[in-house]
Amino acid sequence: MLPKKIDYIKIALIVVGIIALFLPWLTISASTINIKTDEGIHLSVNLAPFRVSSDIKSDTNNIFVEMMMPYVKQYFDMAVKEKMSTFMMIFGIIPIILYIASIFVDKKAVVVGAGIAGITCASIFVVLFTVGLNSSDSGLALTGGKEVTPIDLITGVVNEKSSYLSKDIIKIQVGTGWYLTMIIGLALIAYPFIRKV
């Protein structure tokens, strides 16, 4: 009995699909947002799958600012993590869900679905966050270009003024990334059924 012919194209597609599946994870892990305010406060956000870490420090000699830094960090962490943690999980989980769901339908849908979902998520996430959060010359893009002083941060006003992050960007990304990925994924999963009809 002759050995079964190896389908190298199928193997190559599976490999490409697996790589594409993890593309958002790799890209997000390499993303860091650095912002500096006019008061000399450095804000840094490190993005990783299922996790958002932030750091804040000051290069000013202002004693008041130095004393208030722990409180500034507290509110900065709240503003960033509360807005982004759920969003990060969505973008990490969607490709995996599509991948697993496709396995039970069609092997080609696995590869194509994972690849497109992965590339879509990674592209939208990186472009919008990198361009959006670094678009302000004053370094205040995190707060929509609005002036935010240490006192504003301390009193939690940053949660109100950070509309650029909490509303615009998140809305655009969740809207575009979520629906586009789901539509493509569902179409790919449904394709084998439509093809057989």
Curated annotation (Swiss-Prot):
Keywords: Cell membrane, Membrane, Transmembrane, Transmembrane helix. Its main location: membrane. It is a multi-pass membrane protein. One of its GO terms (cellular component) is plasma membrane. The chain crosses the membrane at residues 11-31, 85-105, 109-129, 174-194. It is found in: Cell membrane. This is Uncharacterized protein MJ0979. It comes from Methanocaldococcus jannaschii (strain ATCC 43067 / DSM 2661 / JAL-1 / JCM 10045 / NBRC 100440). The lineage of its organism: Archaea, Methanobacteriati, Methanobacteriota, Methanomada group, Methanococci.
